[in-house]
């Protein structure tokens, strides 16, 4: 019984420290990709300069482990290692797949009283392309309790056969995204 009481007291103390640290300032929410966002959707927010965040997330049978680092005041990058279960796209990737990927996100401008924060980003452009996407996103706060995010995404963030990707001015590979995956990862992928 005494062991149980000690465990309960330690758990309550740890919980109190967590609540206290969250109350000191608004915590940045991180998505299942380990980047500022909500669930799967990125926001135009960035971390504080020099911040480093490690995350682990599970979504069904899939797992993602990420390290996000704020390189410059407006630029962050993310290294991610994912375990994706039961892929049956082609013979090479049948079954469980382990994917390494890299993301980059650049905040073009900060939020003001009248204008939302605005950012552009690319997910999984150094990897197999399983999670690849590109996006524009805007985020605006209304008071201290409401934040609205909207954007436009391609690749994994969009459906098929929608309008053309503006990143296609950089490479034709952004115009047509294959239904499978590209290679085994570790190479620069732009579409």
Outline where the language-model segments fall.
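Cleavable N-terminal export/targeting peptides
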Residues: 1-32
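Transmembrane beta-barrel domains of Gram-negative outer membranes and organellar outer membranes
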Residues: 25-133, 139-146, 150, 154-159, ...
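Short aromatic-enriched loop/helix-cap "lid" or pocket-rim segments at secondary-structure transitions
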Residues: 163
């Amino acid at each position: 019984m005494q062991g149980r009481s000690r465990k309960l007291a330690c758990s309550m103390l740890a919980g109190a420290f967590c609540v206290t640290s969250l109350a000191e300032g608004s915590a940045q929410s991180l998505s299942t990709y380990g980047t500022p966002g909500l669930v799967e959707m990125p926001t135009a927010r960035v971390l504080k300069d020099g911040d480093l965040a490690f995350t682990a997330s599970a979504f069904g049978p899939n797992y993602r482990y990420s390290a996000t680092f704020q390189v410059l005041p407006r630029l962050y990058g993310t290294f991610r290692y994912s375990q994706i279960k039961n892929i049956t796209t082609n013979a090479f990737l049948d079954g469980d797949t382990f994917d390494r990927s890299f993301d980059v996100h650049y905040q073009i401008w900060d939020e003001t009283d009248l204008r939302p924060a605005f950012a552009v980003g690319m997910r999984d452009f150094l990897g197999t392309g399983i999670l690849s996407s590109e996006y524009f996103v805007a985020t605006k706060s209304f008071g201290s309790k409401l934040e609205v995010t909207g954007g436009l995404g391609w690749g994994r963030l969009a459906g098929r056969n929608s309008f053309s990707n503006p990143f296609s001015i950089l490479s034709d590979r952004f115009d047509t995204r294959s239904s499978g995956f590209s290679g085994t990862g570790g190479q620069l992928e732009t579409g």
